[in-house]
């Protein structure tokens, strides 16, 4: 994350919004590494969900880029309460939004919204691509997808899905990105 920021956002005001889990820890570590040389701020969401919304609104007002480190691929329940309000506030901010791992509120496996979710301009895939990035409706919330090399060996597993590239589908006519198999009556499985 820090290398990505150094390469792309050196002179920008950045706000890390960090949740209570591992994704939040990634944001806190990046903030700590950058805090001496970059214009960065942090807002943390504790497990008790005590939220100072005035502080968050002020931080958002005075930043250019928001890094969404609230929830990652481990999210397994619907977004509710203050977490929902925080995500809605970020989405309404008209600021550039970078999601770490996956936009908060999306399932990394199914691509489904878990209630509400972050509308990211960029998503930083941490180490490897998750299936949910390429499925609907997540595809519409991911923005530009950047794969970050974490310098760790990839897990040894045989994927049960494959990513098809443009070369594989040159002769298939393009369609609306939200189309599904029921809209046309036929499905082509590759």
Task: List each model region and its residues.
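A cross-family phosphate/adenosyl-ligand binding-site feature
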Residues: 2-82, 137-139
């Amino acid at each position: 994350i820090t290398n990505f920021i150094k390469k792309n956002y050196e002179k920008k005001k950045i706000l890390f919004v960090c949740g209570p889990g591992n994704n939040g820890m990634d944001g806190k570590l990046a903030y700590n590494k950058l805090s001496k040389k970059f214009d960065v701020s942090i807002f943390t969401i504790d497990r008790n969900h005590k939220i100072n919304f005035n502080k968050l609104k002020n931080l958002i007002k005075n930043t250019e880029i928001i890094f969404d480190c609230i929830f990652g691929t481990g999210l397994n329940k619907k977004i509710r309460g203050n977490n929902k309000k925080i995500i809605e506030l970020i989405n309404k901010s008209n600021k550039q939004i970078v999601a770490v791992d996956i936009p908060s509120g999306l399932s990394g496996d199914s691509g489904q919204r878990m209630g509400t979710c972050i509308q990211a301009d960029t998503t930083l895939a941490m180490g490897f691509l998750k299936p949910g990035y390429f499925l609907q409706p997540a595809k519409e919330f991911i923005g530009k997808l950047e794969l970050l090399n974490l310098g760790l060996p990839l897990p040894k597993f045989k994927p049960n899905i494959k990513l098809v590239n443009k070369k594989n589908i040159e002769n298939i006519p393009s369609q609306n990105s939200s189309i599904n198999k029921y809209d046309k009556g036929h499905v082509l499985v590759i």
